[in-house]
Amino acid sequence: MFEFWPADLSKATTWPPFAIHSIDLSHFQETSSPQAIAAFVLCSIILYFGFVVVRDPLSHVPTLHWSTPLSRLSQLYTTYYHDRHFTNYSAHSEIPGKRKFRPVVRVGPNEVSLMTAAGVRTVYGGNFEKAAWYEVFSNYGKNNMFSFTGNADHAARRRIFSSNYLKSNVASPYVQQIIQSRIAKLVRFIESAVQEDSKKTQPIVVRNIYRAMQSDISTRFAFADSYGTDWLDTLNGPVNESKHTGMHVMDFFHQELREATFFWESETPFLYLNQLLVPNGPPEQQNAQKWAAGLFREFESILDKSPDRDELVRQGVYGKLYTWRNSDGEPLSFEDRASEMLDHIGAGHDTMSASLEYLTRQISLSPDVQAKLREELCVEHGGSFKTYADLDKFPYLHAVVMEGLRLVYTINFYQPRVVPKGGCTIENIYLPEGTVVGSQAYLVHRQPDIFPDPEAFKPERWLVDEEQF
């Protein structure tokens, strides 16, 4: 017979929460074996899930689906057929079709999504470590600053080149010259394309133009002004496709994030499907890594032979990675350097171009925004500005950029963190340590309590004290 203890299953400390004192074998002799086994298995499953639910530390958190406390299947289904921002956005919608949202929602057995500014500040300002999900962004089998999950590893890698990303360096005459020269070439390219296509009434595909410009800027920032790509010079044809091989292989970062292989690797790594089906990665990933490795080895050869080595090291991120040594005098391996640098170059390949493409579209569709920009840039200030400091003179331009960044979702995945020891409380909901918690800019930027009429493009909303956001 079965005997349960204690009466309150939530206080049970062992599994199963019952003891078998004796079994009457005659009962099994009278009952068919398949029926007995099926009954025993069914009872065990019911008892197990009942025990899980009773002892569940997140039972008080609203859920994506009734099955969420027990399984990730509902989350995986919507993520596979849509994407993460759709999954979490729909989870936060308390009433379908209504603009009412739940600030904290459970989207997995041990995973919580946030749609609250206070929660974002707690998680991303509270030094929470990254979840293992980030390891999908490693390259060449090595982690980089973005894919490191531990804060210590992340900080140690960041210290190598942090000076390159200081505002004082980004706003330096050297970096400004890099950016302004590529923008000037971009403007000339667009003007020429408009003149050539004016009689053909054929649209100009601006995304490829913006991708080429961004890659030219980021590679010059990574290496040195004289050793970056010149992809703006390789564009041709009605859709401005590049003739350069590198331009095509770098599209891996645009395509692969939307392919099933990324889903299997990031959402279900325990199945090892990618390792079984594409052990060396998808062809696009292999091509991107092969092209980038050749680029990095070529620049290392230049560093070894150049009489201006010290200046090249000072100017670029890769030079610092190449010459860095740890306390034992050991350098980073080539794979470590390549993984880091490919992440730096690839990270902005699609994000900046998508943001600029969205802004171009919105401004083109908004004659009133165009008129206000012309008034501010050309009439009030004569269209003259030479440094980044001059941009502070243009509050409406700043508002247009901020509104574009608010609405465009260039990074549509949420950024999971792990609740540290001791747990935390968000929106009066306690989350125990080890809980995976995260948010998406897409969600917070569409919260009507913060941004009224959130889907509308309204730059004027930023012409106030931004601290209110």
UniProtKB/Swiss-Prot annotation:
It is found in: Membrane. One of its GO terms (molecular function) is iron ion binding. GO terms for biological process: secondary metabolite biosynthetic process. The chain crosses the membrane at residues 34-54. Pathway: Polyketide biosynthesis. Cytochrome P450 monooxygenase-like protein; part of the cluster that mediates the biosynthesis of a highly modified cyclo-arginine-tryptophan dipeptide (cRW). The first step of the pathway is perfornmed by the arginine-containing cyclodipeptide synthase (RCPDS) avaA that acts as the scaffold-generating enzyme and is responsible for formation of the cyclo-Arg-Trp (cRW) diketopiperazine. AvaB then acts as a multifunctional flavoenzyme that is responsible for generating the cyclo-Arg-formylkynurenine DKP, which can be deformylated by avaC. This is Cytochrome P450 monooxygenase-like protein avaF. It comes from Aspergillus versicolor.
